[in-house]
Amino acid sequence: MNDKPQKRTKCDGEKISADSTVHADLEARMICIFGEITPASHLAMIDCLNRLSESDTDVTVYINSQGGNLTSALAIYDMFTHGRYPFKITTVATGQAFSAALIILQGGHERKMFRHAKLLLHRPRFTFSGGDSLDRGDLKYEDEMLQEFEKEICELLTEKTGKKIAAIYKDMATEKIFTAKEAIDYGLADEII
C-alpha cells in the first residue's frame, strides 16, 4: 500500500494537496491559506467554496502567509465579498497576513486576528526572476500596472477602514507593520481572539 499522499490541485474530500498553499477540512468548514498566494491558491479556493456551498453553515478561513500574487489575492477577496455563497466567511490572521494576504483578510464578513499575529501593508511590486529582461516600454507598462494596483488597494482599504486614501498611500509607502491591536485601531481587523 502506498502511504504517500496523492497530489491534487483542487479541494478533494477533506484536504487539498500537500503542495498547495490552500488546505481545507470540509467537515469542520475550515480553510487554511498557509504559504505563498499563487494562481493555484485561487483555483483551490474556488473549488473549496463551491463544495462548501452545499450548506449554509459559516466558513472560517485561517491565514498565515507572507503574501504573493496580488491578482490572485484580489480575486479571492472578490470571491469572499461578492460570491453568492449561502454562508458568511470569517477570516483569521494566525501568524502573519503580509502583503497580498492582508487583502484576503479584508474579504471576511468578520476579520479576526490571533493576539500575536501581524499584518504588513506595503506598495505593490513586481518580482522578476529567471533572467527576465525589460526594455523601457516594458518598464512603463509595469509602472502603470503598479500604479493601478496601488489605487485599487487604497480604494479597497479606504472602504474597509474608513481612512482617507492619502493616509493609506502614506502608510503603504513606509511598509507599515501592524500588531493585532494596531490593526483593530486602524480598522484592518474587527476582533482579537
Predicted segments, located by residue:
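Terminal-region recognition feature
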Residues: 1-193
